[in-house]
Amino acid sequence: MKGLHPNTLTDLEFDHVLDQIVMFGHTEDGKKQISALRPIQGQKNIVTELKTVEEYKASFGSDQGIPAHGYDSLSRIHHHLGIENSLLELSDFKKIRHVCITTQSLVLFFKKYQEFYLELSRVSDQVVYRSEVVQSIDQVIDKYGQVKDQASEQLMVLRKSLLKVKGMINQSFVKALRHYAQLDYLDEIRETVVDNKRVLAIKAMHRKKVKGMVLGHSKTGSIVYIEPQQTIEFAQEFSQLVYLEAEEVKRLLKALTNLLRPYSSSLAAYEGYLTQMDVWHAKARYALTINGIRPIITDHRVLDLKQAYHPLLLASHRVDKKFTHPQDIILDAERRIIVISGPNAGGKSITLKTVGLLQLMIQSGLLIPVDPSSELCIFDRILTDIGDHQSIENHLSTYSYRLK
């Protein structure tokens, strides 16, 4: 299409159609692309898009249903991968892995069922899947999104030490608890937690008889909370090990980030592929709600709409449980003009909008609510001059609108 005036989109309420399609999108990038949909250039490309959406629509009632395609945006991750020596967050690797696995499942699916999805398979065949991305992530991160003990020998040693020292902390605390219980230094509650540390609940009169650090006291002052001295020594060792573990995890994640950095363009390609799948999915889902089909696209100068419905009116009437009347409209090389007459609010503007909107939809790769025997050609331009600029659901006549 050579040009499309913004008034045409407004007159035909094309954005209202897009708003309905957006509701079927699963991804933010997909929804953005749907909102920006405009007519496709070239008849061949239009037909290919219509066939693709038609295939996706057919999958909803098939035993070979297309796998899920949802994903979380990687835009922030792409930004960080473009910065030298940057470090991705642990959750970022889970998102990357999900995008890769989702892409792989779709690629394998379309290879297996190529005979059912010719157009979708052609697109899928162009995706170059790099299995080493997932393999690299799986060597470091487990299925729960945490760094594996086996990610490095150093990390395994540190985590074993952490478990050992943690056990020693518990043992030393229990030993102190029993000791001071025998001396009757403990209050009835015996112990509690202060600042994430187990402490002894010592009667205030015995506070100076207990070795350790005072971390607080009760509101009445009758109980003093003390961390036993031996527990403190092990806790200090534990804190040092936690620090060393965090540093080793950071080193591993930095190495993994650097390993994945060259694959940024591949990840962007996967994301683009999944976004396109989301657009086709939304188009197909919308087509189901309006009984949209792919009409005959002809090279001849013909516009032959049979049993054509205005999609917005159809949706509105469905909510109100009203019947929608279809229309038959034909224009060709010999019958280039139709004169429509009738009373106020008699449906003349609706007919104009039906023809214009369905043509705009078909050239944007959307299936339309018409009889399958309908024929449409492709136009270079779509021009409109419709007096009623109100939403079609308002049922305001052109005459009434201009009186306002």
Task: List where the protein language model places each region.
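Alpha-helical coupling/stalk and coiled-coil linker elements that connect catalytic or binding modules
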Residues: 1-65, 81-91, 95-97, 104, ...
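Generic hydrophobic secondary-structure packing signal
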Residues: 49, 99, 352, 395-402
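N-terminal extracellular/luminal ectodomains immediately following the signal peptide in secreted
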Residues: 70-71
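Extended, well-ordered alpha-helical scaffold/bundle regions in very large, multi-domain proteins
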Residues: 123-126
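Terminal transmembrane helical anchor/hairpin motif
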Residues: 128-129, 134
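Switch/coupling sub-region of P-loop NTPases
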Residues: 378-404
